Amino acid sequence: MATRALLLLLLLPPLLLLAGCAARPAPPRAPRHSDGTFTSELSRLRDSARLQRLLQGLVGKRSQQDPENNTAWTKSGEDRLCQLWSHMPALQAWMPMKPPVDQAWSPWLPPGLRAGALVSEPAIPAAEGSPMPP
């Protein structure tokens, strides 16, 4: 009987403490800055300016006073480009020469072999005077 009472005294307090903690609700938490309850006027202005820059960047409408995004030069450049492309000798002089197709490098062929078809001699020579097939 004494062992039973001693066992009951040892196990009862932790059980009561665990049951008591689960029954009580947690105290209400004070509102925090991370909840968004506090915003200063400066942070509001920064957020609105950031959003405005993002929208302007997405839409592509920047102010005309912004020197880095001024696109007044594009029209004259396009005209010059069209004139350059219409002058073929100047274009051909500017472009590098390409090797002929039979001397072109191929990743599938070993060095020494060239791209193109190899033509072998006919197995039976044609008689003189008979036409060769094309």
Swiss-Prot record:
Cellular component annotations (GO), alphabetically ordered: extracellular space
Where are the Valine amide modifications?
Answer: V59
**Residues modified to Phosphoserine:** S63
Give the matching InterPro entries: Glucagon_GIP_secretin_VIP, Prosecretin
Annotated keywords: Amidation, Cleavage on pair of basic residues, Hormone, Pharmaceutical, Phosphoprotein, Secreted, Signal
Domain of life according to the entry: Eukaryota
Which GO BP terms apply? adenylate cyclase-activating G protein-coupled receptor signaling pathway; diet induced thermogenesis; hippocampus development; intracellular water homeostasis; positive regulation of lipid catabolic process; regulation of appetite; regulation of synaptic plasticity; response to nutrient levels
TM regions (residue ranges): none
The signal sequence is 1-21
Can you say where in the cell this protein is located? Secreted
GO molecular function per UniProt: digestive hormone activity; G protein-coupled receptor binding; hormone activity
Q: Which ranges of residues are annotated as propeptide in this record? A: 22-31, 63-134
What is the stated purpose of this protein? Answer: Hormone involved in different processes, such as regulation of the pH of the duodenal content, food intake and water homeostasis. Exerts its biological effects by binding to secretin receptor (SCTR), a G-protein coupled receptor expressed in the basolateral domain of several cells. Acts as a key gastrointestinal hormone by regulating the pH of the duodenal content.
Q: Which family does it belong to?
A: Belongs to the glucagon family.
Q: What is this protein called?
A: Secretin
Q: What is the lineage of its organism?
A: Eukaryota, Metazoa, Chordata, Craniata, Vertebrata
